[in-house]
Amino acid sequence: MAGKAGRKQASSNAKIIQGLYKQVSLFLGMAIVRLFISRKVTIGQWIKLVALNVPMFVALYIIVLSGKPKYDGNRVVKQGIDLNDNTNLISYFFDLIYLSLFGNIGIIAFRTFKFWWCLLLCPIYAGYKLYGLKNMFMPGAQQTQADNRSKNANEGQSKSKRQMKRERRGETDSKIKYKYR
């Protein structure tokens, strides 16, 4: 029972990696065939195809290296990191792979490399995430001032909630001071 979760994660990772291999080989193969049957193909277009797919291959290599399970016979030795987890760096590698495949779809359908401009979304998105992370650990001047104001307001508020509620009721119910049963 103890190794059941590890075996489950290992089989899930193996399926994900196998699916990635199928998708990459399908779309890249179709893009290569499309360039082969095109009439006006230059060496520069082949170099572009290779150069623009290098980030995808690096991301795929890192995913396989870190997520591929290792077996010793029928026993799982290492299950790899969880590839279904969206909170780690692996999710960005998946995004990079899918954006590269989108660029290959542009080659397949329209014989253009303009779809590869979508790869600029990766560093922009990473910068956005890093900026949010920076603000979480190193707040700016505006956030520091707002925190100081809220601390001062909390220090000035020395009365408990019950006392404040009594004062409010006292202001509204000034006619009735005692209630008998």
From Swiss-Prot:
Coiled coil: none annotated. The chain crosses the membrane at residues 16-36, 46-66, 90-110, 113-133. It is a multi-pass membrane protein. Interacts with SND1, PHO88/SND3 and the translocon complex subunit SEC61. ENV10/SND2 and PHO88/SND3 form a complex with the translocon in the endoplasmic reticulum membrane. Belongs to the TMEM208 family. Disruption phenotype: Exhibits cold sensitivity and leads to internal accumulation of precursor CPY. Residues 1-15, 67-89, 134-181 are cytoplasmic. Residues 37-45, 111-112 are lumenal. Pfam families: TMEM208_SND2. Residues 144-157 have a biased composition (Polar residues). It is found in: Endoplasmic reticulum membrane. Functions in the SND pathway, a SRP (signal recognition particle) and GET (guided entry of tail-anchored proteins) independent pathway for targeting a broad range of substrate proteins to the endoplasmic reticulum. SND functions in parallel to GET in targeting proteins with downstream hydrophobic motifs. Involved in vacuolar processing and morphology. GO terms for biological process: protein transport; vacuolar protein processing. Residues 168-181 have a biased composition (Basic and acidic residues). Residues 144-181 are annotated as: Disordered. This is SRP-independent targeting protein 2. Keywords: Endoplasmic reticulum, Membrane, Protein transport, Transmembrane, Transmembrane helix, Transport. InterPro entries: SND2/TMEM208 (IPR008506). One of its GO terms (cellular component) is endoplasmic reticulum membrane. The keyword Transport applies. The lineage of its organism: Eukaryota, Fungi, Dikarya, Ascomycota, Saccharomycotina. The keyword Transmembrane applies.
